[in-house]
Amino acid sequence: MKKKALLPLFLGIMIFLAGCDYSTPEKQDGFFFNTFVQPMKHLLQWLGNDVFHNNFGLAIIVLVLFIRLILLPFMLSNYKNSHMMREKMKVAKPEVDGIQEKVKRARTQEEKMAANQELMEVYKKYDMNPMKSMLGCLPILIQMPIIMGLYFVLKDKLVNGLSEHPHFLWFNLTKPDIWITVIAGVLYFIQAVVSSKTMPQEQRQMGYMMMVISPIMIIWISLQASSALGLYWSVSALFLVIQTHFANIYYSKLAKKEVQPFIEKYEREHNPYSKKKGKNTQVVSKKNKK
């Protein structure tokens, strides 16, 4: 559901980006411009002109790292919740599937409410909170106004000094560049692949769709804007690939360790052999004492 909700969001952003124009002074007003575009303009001017002495490429890279560090606590929390939910669902799935069948067969509203209440009890039993998965959208929602502000700053050439010092590496930051655009698209595809490895099987199809949609959107928007936006996305995607890879390794081990008590409890409750084995062990220990 979370991934599906992002599709209309991206579509709305594309329409918004296509319709706004801040290229002339008389148009540079309004809530969005004053809240997001103007601060981004001043920040880039300060980093590019004063801190890095007319190197706006380095200014954009530092800006990416700064934004990513702000988002890091939200991202780590999202990784942890995702891994915990997936591991706990492996244990709770038989019970959840049984209750969901009850919901489908329910003929009255009272029966549905009773089944849903039973489902909530199962979630509580395994310390699961499905609402936490909704927080996965939070880093995207926080970052979107920042990216959109940067988009208009670069598209409408609002940063003083950038036109005089536009070069970074092999490309001109004020013009589209096919290679940095392709790099951004490829890196976002890799990031989607890395993220999809931890998705539950039922969510894989939507994950594969995002693998295609995200790079296409990145490439399309980057070709409409200057290569500075492609640089922003390339550095951001590279950071995400590294962050996601190591977070998946760490939180996968942590989730399996924390879920182990639930697995052992489930096996004791649902595996008669383990109960008999436990009783036999107690009998043997008593005989040994005698």
From Swiss-Prot:
What does UniProt give as the signal peptide span?
1-19
Its localization reads: Cell membrane
Top-level taxon of the source organism: Bacteria
Lipid group attachment sites (N-palmitoyl cysteine): 20
**Single GO biological process annotation from the record:** protein insertion into membrane
Does the entry feature the keyword Cell membrane, yes or no? yes
Q: Which residues cross the membrane?
A: 56-76, 134-154, 176-196, 211-231, 232-252
Main location per UniProt? membrane
Topological type in the membrane? Multi-pass membrane protein
Q: Name one GO molecular function term.
A: membrane insertase activity
Q: Does the keyword Transmembrane helix apply?
A: yes
Region Disordered: which residues?
270-290
**Compositional bias (Polar residues) at which positions?**
280-290
Q: Which family does it belong to?
A: Belongs to the OXA1/ALB3/YidC family. Type 2 subfamily.
Function recorded in the entry:
Required for the insertion and/or proper folding and/or complex formation of integral membrane proteins into the membrane. Involved in integration of membrane proteins that insert both dependently and independently of the Sec translocase complex, as well as at least some lipoproteins.
Descriptive protein name = Membrane protein insertase YidC 1
- What species is this protein from? Staphylococcus epidermidis (strain ATCC 12228 / FDA PCI 1200)
